[in-house]
Amino acid sequence: MKKLLIAATVVLVSSSPLVLLPMEKELTLTPKQVQKLTQNTTASLTQFKQVPKNPRTITTILTYKNKDLTEFKTSIQADTKLSISAIFWNAKGEPVFQLQDGDYVAASQKSIVDDSIYNQKPVDMTFWTKDGLTVYKEPYVLGTEKADSKLASFKPIKVSKAAQTHAGTYYLVDGEGWINASDLSRIDNRIEAVQKVLNEKYNNQERISVYVKQLDTDRVAAINDEKSMYAASVAKLGVLYYAQERLSQKKLSLSDEYQYTSAVNGFPGAYDPDGSGKISKMPDDKNYSLENLLKAVAQNSDNVATNILGYYVTNQYDKAFQKSVDKAAATSWNMDKKELTARAAGTLMEAIYRQNGDIITYLSSTDYDGERISKNIDVPVAHKIGDAYDFKHDVAIVYADSPFILSIFTDKEGYDKITSIADDVYGILK
């Protein structure tokens, strides 16, 4: 047996008989009586008690000729404004609306809503507009007109008021109109615009891989970013990252020196010394400082400098090197085959950005700043290029107001294609 003090809005349901205690007397209800009482209470909570200011149907409703709703007349479709003249309670104790034409409908909040504006209050908030947003003259209720607004998608806006309607929460942009919260983002959403452009212009071009990551939001846009290509000199980012890590750990010093012997060009994974760079192609047995070697790799893409660092600093790309770089790149960084993806290169460039060491400075002033990604960009760019055979790549940190990673791998495409992609991305994220 359970006891319950009679109250207007509280009912406890039990499978056993329920005892109500009005004053000092006990009243026992059967389970069926409890169920009926519960149903009546639930129905009461979903029924109107007065005529709403701006009634609108949200489902198809039936109309009747009498208050008891037994003589069917017709139906009214959803999203129809109602003209209600009065509210009555019929013989069953159910509230019903009388329409202006004399018909009756159930006064249920399950099928009719008060389509009015309420809870309007001042706010001071910033949002980003979503693609295809709609601006209204007032918070939306049925019949509200759209505003003549020139607000663009993927732009920051300030709002000054918030209001509720049955359609949701709306925010006021002064001088423009009201926007539903579903058309707004609390975080910078421009990466969605980047993805849209990539899809429209480059997605069907299998010889292009692009990875973009906004560093303030950690949001990514990409096409073919998991496609593996010969990375050429982009793979040198692994050497730069590892050297910076050991510098930060005080295990190395920029003044450390290493001798250029014939051995440095002969270990597995070594670059062809006849390739890019200014250091002698033939071993000269001279000592080179770590600082100068890092600058040569970052700024001149020097193959010999990479080999010297690979031989001494990474111990010929040993397990410690591999473990560290694989973790930073979130994938296996293959210095032998040098097969990598735009995503892996972009991820490692982000790791170098997070290190915030000397490597960033070196990568910001290279022999290749007048081409590819940085060609038309008017903010600082730290980047690493890669060229071999038909492969042309560039991986960059672009220091816009909201910095981002841009990694572009291409096969059988020119530098201008990389520049075009970079211009498209920067045009949105600058």
Q: What feature does the model see in each segment?
A:
Residues 189-193, 262, 268-355:
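Active-site-adjacent helix/loop patches that line small-molecule binding or acyl-intermediate pockets
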Residues 174, 213-216, 261-263, 297-301, ...:
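Active-site-proximal beta-strand/loop segments in catalytic clefts of secreted hydrolases
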Residues 230-260, 297, 406:
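Active-site SXXK
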Residues 109-141, 145-205:
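Non-catalytic propeptide/linker segments at domain boundaries
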Residues 183-228, 298:
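Beta-lactamase-like hydrolase cores
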Residues 2-5, 10-63, 75-76, 92-95, ...:
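SH3-family beta-barrel domains
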